[in-house]
Amino acid sequence: MKMILEHATSAELLWGQRQTVEQDLECWHFTSATQDISIWLEPSTMAHVCPFGQLLIAELDVRKGVFAINHIVVIKEIEDAAVITRHFAWVPAGKESLLRDIWGMLNYLPSPALRSFYKSVLADDELMLPFLTAMASHHHHHDYAGGLIEHSHEVAMTAAALSLLHGLEPLSVSVAFIGGLLHDIGKIHLYYNVQGAHGVLGQHESFNFMVLAKQLTVLRQSAPKLFEALSSCLSIKFRHQTDAYLPSTIVHMCDRLSVDVCNWRRAFANVPHYYWYAKSPRDALMYKRLS
């Protein structure tokens, strides 16, 4: 699990497929959200990768026109290149690394039921297209195209890191990550993310369960406790309410942190460097800094 939090910044999500073999070399084709290249490699380099196509996390190294691939991690059991290609097309520019972390999490899920749930969510085009392109709010935080997935990714990564820091077992860390990633997914149905008259205004947490109804139904049948724990992450958090599941507590804390960091950064975005306090244009609150 720590590996997903420690990927090199240059590592990216790739689809790799062998094109041809000549003498002692293999030609492999790699596509990502930003690259489309073919590289000649020694057979040993890709010996653990399915030649017919496989999802990878790796570093593509270009030096003086010579291509190489390093630190290859195989994402198991993903064989549909079309799904990955669509995600590459949908993810907003500059947010490509989010896909690396989101898909890479599949390698670290200890429960087959949770893995099946997560794969089903990622493969659902009707869900993932708006999720990758929506805003997280109208005029509050992360209120721009791609803001929802950016905020959700922040919550997921921070929740997983805190869970590891506090010594939670792998299953709880996994629930914290997935719960953090999906805690706001109901926002894809809110008025500021839906064109025309079909958008709604209401508690987005209640829409989480509508958006994920198909996947959650299967999870409830196969792993009731996991369903309960994940549902706690997706539910409305009332003031002074204590969550029975610690991953839920962590997710709600990280949600607030992501919002506050976004508004803190905006408060100081357009003021001189020597200002030590400023009012956020979004929430009208006063923020301070030490340097």
Provide a role label for each language-model segment.
Residues 1-2, 56, 140:
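Hydrophobic alpha-helical segments at protein termini of multi-pass membrane proteins
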Residues 19-41:
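OB-fold (S1/OB) nucleic-acid-binding surfaces
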Residues 258, 273-287:
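C-terminal membrane module of polytopic membrane proteins
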Residues 61-92:
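OB-fold/S1-family single-stranded nucleic acid-binding modules
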Residues 80-198:
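Acidic/His-rich, divalent-metal-binding segments that scaffold phosphate/diphosphate chemistry
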Residues 42-59:
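Short nucleic-acid-contacting surface segments enriched for D/E, G, S/T with interspersed K/R
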Residues 3-23:
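Structural detector for short beta-strands of small beta-barrel domains
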Residues 144, 162-273:
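Divalent metal-dependent catalytic cores for phosphoryl transfer on phosphate-bearing substrates
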